[in-house]
Amino acid sequence: MNILFVRLSYIGDILHATPAARWIKEHYPEAKLHWIVTPSMVELLKNNPYVDEIIPWERDEYEAHSKKLHIPTMWRMWWELRDKLKPYKFDVAVDVQGRLITGLVLLASGAPIRLGLGGTKELNWLFTNYKAKPSTDHVIKRYIEVAELLNTAVTEHSDLNVSSAVSEDNVKPCITNGAAGKKLYHMDFFVPSDLQVWAEEQWKSISYDTSLERSEVEKPLRVGLVLGTSWATKEWPQEKWYSLIKSLQYRANFVCLGGLKEATQYKPLMDSLTADGLDKIMLNMLGKTTLQEVGALIESCDVVVTADTGSLHI
């Protein structure tokens, strides 16, 4: 059984969808799960044992043309996507994004069985023939409920090439409490061992302060600071970041994480830290890391302080 899993973007949303992909592979291990995603997000799914193949598609480019009503270009890109997906001969497509653009991806997949969210907007409901009930539950639970529709689809389509897929365990509702519930809901992001080693090397490059106060700390805490966010209303003032670092200067080392935007935006903060000698206990990684490297650095931290942004979910 070939399955196309559709969650195109962005960091937090894709990570929230990983439990649903894992549910599918754990309940239907013989199925091949292909995840279609925006190219810039591919790294989030690398090394994920529950994803057999990552299919990149220029979702952002398509949306840009959509906003400008470039109909010929949109039509061309859709047909190119259709031609790209056709050789896979998908049996099932699973859409946990629920937008018009993902509905068009379902249509391009050619899959006869199309699972999706209930209560969606942008006409997405036109493209799915199995829908989860509308819900206000946590998004991870809602995504898993879409995946669980596969049980119903398999029982109704005997032509699907699935052996012993549906059992009593499969058709139980998703668990929502206790240790099993935590396992069900945990998000997947896999950091390879070579990047774990790389992260350790970054910490070793910090020049330790040899002051009396500092020397009393046997092993400073490793604190990750994710400085930026996409929304100005969610920003923490730069002077607050400075105060946090200053207050912990004798107890911690820091790594600053963010993209190229943050490298420019937070230059005043970096300059202030340098002027006060605090750069000696700081790794400035703004605009210097891939998503996998961000994951490795976050994994190596004791504490992470972050704005409401993608790396929060990592």
What are these regions (language model features)?
Residues M1-I314:
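Catalytic machinery of carbohydrate-active enzymes
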